[in-house]
Amino acid sequence: MQNRSDCRKKPLNIYEIHFGSFRKPSDKADDWYNYEEMIDILIPYLVKNGYNYLEIMPLNEYPCDESWGYQATGFFSPTSRYGTADQLKAFVDVCHKHGIGVLMDFVPVHFAVDSYGLANYDGTSLFEYPNSAVGVSEWGSCNFMHSRGETRSFLQSCANYWISEFHMDGIRMDAISRAIYWQGDPARGVNLNAVEFLQYMNQGLKGMHPSVILAAEDST
């Protein structure tokens, strides 16, 4: 933690990767290097090329390889594709020792429809909209209903978990325009509940972690 990179002292030079695609042991679809193996593969590359931040596409557990982690089922679970939680912690720690901060993509807008995830969690639409007109995203996933206290608490707790437990230096929130505007369409108007959620999220995380980097994707 003491050796983590500090974006306030120098310009950010960010390298973004999908962990399972940077380099593979073989051409097999389900053959990946684990978190610890990537220490000697990825970190020297970042140092050599002068990167001081690594942005990793979602590391939460997800069922479909093709989604690259953007349709999550296990928001509090590092994907086992690349090893254990302790191995991920070791990877982040070595990044910090080399002056490289670690940012993680986080998806607070939608989640996978699989029954073993959040969909219909308690037999009701606890986290998602009951109305399919706004409840289903363009990717066929469930949109989070950001007006609900359960949703806000869950997502902020999840982001705090990754920062606190894995020492992530920042969170990049994905597809935010799909939350701010109904179904991502400015012509349909602003979703004020989603705007309030983002304010709640940012204020809460900054209160707990003043130096954390909070970024968002706006694809309007």
Language-model segments: residues:
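Conserved alpha/beta catalytic core and glycan-binding cleft of carbohydrate-active enzymes
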Residues: 167-169, 181-220
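Substrate-binding/active-site clefts of carbohydrate-active enzymes
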Residues: 2-12, 18-168, 172-190
